[in-house]
């Protein structure tokens, strides 16, 4: 009979909700509902949005270049389906409105009306109800087709994280590494904090050589970053030592200071550090400092370092950054990448086996998630 009763019924329904979701619900529905319950009922009634009689926790976030306010519903599982769609759809859409996405994915749109929702409510209540029902129906049909909530739930269980945590990459990757280590009966050390600037250079992007060229070729390396990590068996527990980059630091600093280049541009045409190049050239006229893990250091010629790594019978290898890794046992991170890579191959095979477009789309989405896991691990471990 009145708005207060309607909001009370809504709160009753939330009591047994497994997952709360909506389209742009983080930016609109949740803050609107919390504010409305506070105004119509009371602030104390907003505790029903949460568990353990707690109040919703206000939080600010940035979206579309503007700062917005929302609320975290303590103890509840809330996932904004618009953000879920943006995360697991790997091409840009011209619009992320529910109307546009509904038309693209389902061939259905929101119910059109003229004027404001307030005037629609007062002048055509039946259409107002139909408008709201269609919004919910579109969301329900989208998830029945895409199954993104099921996918996020699967990722959450596989990596033992909360369902909303799957919206990011760092926490999921970190927990996946920890879980993989525990499966091998290894204890993971606490995270270490480093003071100062710990930023790393991004990927090298070569400047194009302008003009007409003949015999153009392209090389697309399969899962480049994961493949490099696996090939070198890269991991904190597999590090033997590090060539101190004295020459390289001086060279890069000169490029930045005297030639006014950016840090990334200073590496133009360099495959690896100068120390690495000296080692691979087996130069006996270049002396290097090798810092051992966990402590100690030695002064060796580049030729001696080459022989130590590649000709001493040790199962060692050298990265272009001058880090020596051992490969007598597979590292945690390379082994995790091996697992993900194998799982993706299985999913790609299943995609070929099934016959319907819906089944193919189902497996394609899942193999794409594994691809994102593989390629995002490099960036995630920097954090």
At which residue positions do the language-model features occur?
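Active-site-proximal structural scaffolding
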Residues: 3, 26, 30, 91-95, ...
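Conserved DEDDh/DEDDy metal-dependent 3′-5′ exonuclease domain
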Residues: 1-93
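Acidic, Mg2+-coordinating catalytic module of metal-dependent nucleases/exonucleases
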Residues: 15-29, 33, 82-170
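Common nucleic-acid-contacting/processivity interface regions adjacent to the catalytic cores
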Residues: 118-259, 359-383
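Non-catalytic nucleic-acid-binding interfaces of large nucleic-acid enzymes and RNP effectors
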Residues: 15-16, 39-72, 107, 117-118, ...
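Helical catalytic core of nucleic-acid polymerases
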Residues: 221-383
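Generic, well-ordered alpha-helical scaffold segments in large soluble proteins
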Residues: 10-16, 20-23, 32-36, 40, ...
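Short runs of predominantly hydrophobic/aromatic residues within well-ordered alpha helices
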Residues: 7-10, 78-81, 98, 174, ...
């Amino acid at each position: 009979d009145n708005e207060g009763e309607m909001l009370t019924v809504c709160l009753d329904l939330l009591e047994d909700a497994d997952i709360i979701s909506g389209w742009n619900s983080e930016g609109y529905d949740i803050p609107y509902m919390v504010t409305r319950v506070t105004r119509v009922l009371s602030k104390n009634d907003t505790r029903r949005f949460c568990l353990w009689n707690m109040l919703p926790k206000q939080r600010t976030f940035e979206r579309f270049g503007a700062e917005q306010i929302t609320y975290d519903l303590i103890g509840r599982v809330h996932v904004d389906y618009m953000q879920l769609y943006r995360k697991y759809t790997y091409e840009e859409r011209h619009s992320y409105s529910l109307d546009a996405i509904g038309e693209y994915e389902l061939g259905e749109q929101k119910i059109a009306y003229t004027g404001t929702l307030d005037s629609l409510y007062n002048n055509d209540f039946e259409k107002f109800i139909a408008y709201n029902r269609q919004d919910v129906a579109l969301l329900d049909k989208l998830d029945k087709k895409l199954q993104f909530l099921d996918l996020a739930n699967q990722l959450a269980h596989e990596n033992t994280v909360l369902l909303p945590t799957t919206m990011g990459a760092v926490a999921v990757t970190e927990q996946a590494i920890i879980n993989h280590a525990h499966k091998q009966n290894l204890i993971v050390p606490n995270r270490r904090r480093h003071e100062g600037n710990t930023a790393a250079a991004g990927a090298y992007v070569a400047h194009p050589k302008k003009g007409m060229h003949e015999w153009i070729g392209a090389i697309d390396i399969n899962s480049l970053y994961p493949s490099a990590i696996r090939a070198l068996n890269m991991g904190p527990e597999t590090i033997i030592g590090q060539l101190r980059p004295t020459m390289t630091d001086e060279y890069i600093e000169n490029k930045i200071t005297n030639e006014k280049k950016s840090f990334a541009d200073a590496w133009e045409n360099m495959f690896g550090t100068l120390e690495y190049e000296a080692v691979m050239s087996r130069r006996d006229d270049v002396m290097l400092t090798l810092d051992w893990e966990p402590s100690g250091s030695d002064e060796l010629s580049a030729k001696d370092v080459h022989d130590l790594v590649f000709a001493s019978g040790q199962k060692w290898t050298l990265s272009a950054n001058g880090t020596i890794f051992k490969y007598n046992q597979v590292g945690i991170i390379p082994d995790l990448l091996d697992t993900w890579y194998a799982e993706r191959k299985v999913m790609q095979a299943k995609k070929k086996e099934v016959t319907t477009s819906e089944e193919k789309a189902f497996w394609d989405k899942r193999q794409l998630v594994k691809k994102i896991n593989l390629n995002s691990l490099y960036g995630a471990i920097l954090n």
